[in-house]
Amino acid sequence: MAAKIFCLIMLLGLSASAATASIFPQCSQAPIASLLPPYLSPAMSSVCENPILLPYRIQQAIAAGILPLSPLFLQQSSALLQQLPLVHLLAQNIRAQQLQQLVLANLAAYSQQQQLPLVHLLAQNIRAQQLQQLVLANLAAYSQQQQFLPFNQLAALNSAAYLQQQQLLPFSQLAAAYPRQFLPFNQLAALNSHAYVQQQQLLPFSQLAAVSPAAFLTQQHLLPFYLHTAPNVGTLLQLQQLLPFDQLALTNPAVFYQQPIIGGALF
């Protein structure tokens, strides 16, 4: 009896599962239709009968809707690719126009920059012309400066000799003006340079040379006699200082030389 009851329960369960399996596909038609995109065709939406096939059916419907649009997309892409060189050319033209406007705006500065070497060359030529004009205007001073160039070199090498030579310059000019009168002293310089230098060192103390060259030459003629009578340089210097006050030495040097008593009384 119990076995019969158990078999009856099993049959009721199987019938209930079969009824449920036949109902679910019929109830799932409305949700599936609501999930499909609106741009799909009715034929595509009607084929969706099983929920398991829903993703695959949706993918096929999307592909079927996109494929008719693909030729237009390819045509637009090819047109864009063909227009790329024109875009590059247009960009280059814009850059060239901007550069041209910049050059036109700074044309003055650009021209000045290009003319800088010419300006420097012109300035150098002007300086050279000014120097040449200065040399031509002061040709005498320039030649005199060139003549003194050896003395300047001597001053750089030996300052003492340069100072001694500078002290002798006035008398050298006087000797050039009166070469015959200075001939004995030139011979003395050739024979005894030390005595000549001592004699020339005493000459600046005589103011008579600047006042009267003739009297100075007479005084120079008397120097050899003083070199014999006054071997001391200090004594000779004192005699040189007394010469302007002795009028006899200027008028008659021979008579003045015959008066050694004056020298003995003074020194």
UniProtKB/Swiss-Prot annotation:
UniProt entry tagged with the keyword Repeat: yes
Note: The alpha zeins of 19 kDa and 22 kDa account for 70% of the total zein fraction. They are encoded by a large multigene family.
A Pfam family reported for this protein in Swiss-Prot or TrEMBL: Zein
Keyword Signal found: yes
Function (record text): Zeins are major seed storage proteins.
Top-level taxon: Eukaryota
Signal sequence coordinates: 1-21
Alphabetically ordered keywords of this record: Repeat, Seed storage protein, Signal, Storage protein
UniProt cross-references to InterPro entries, sorted A to Z: Zein, Zein-alpha
PANTHER family: ZEIN-ALPHA PMS2
Family, per entry: Belongs to the zein family.
GO MF, any single term: nutrient reservoir activity
Protein name (database record): Zein-alpha Z4
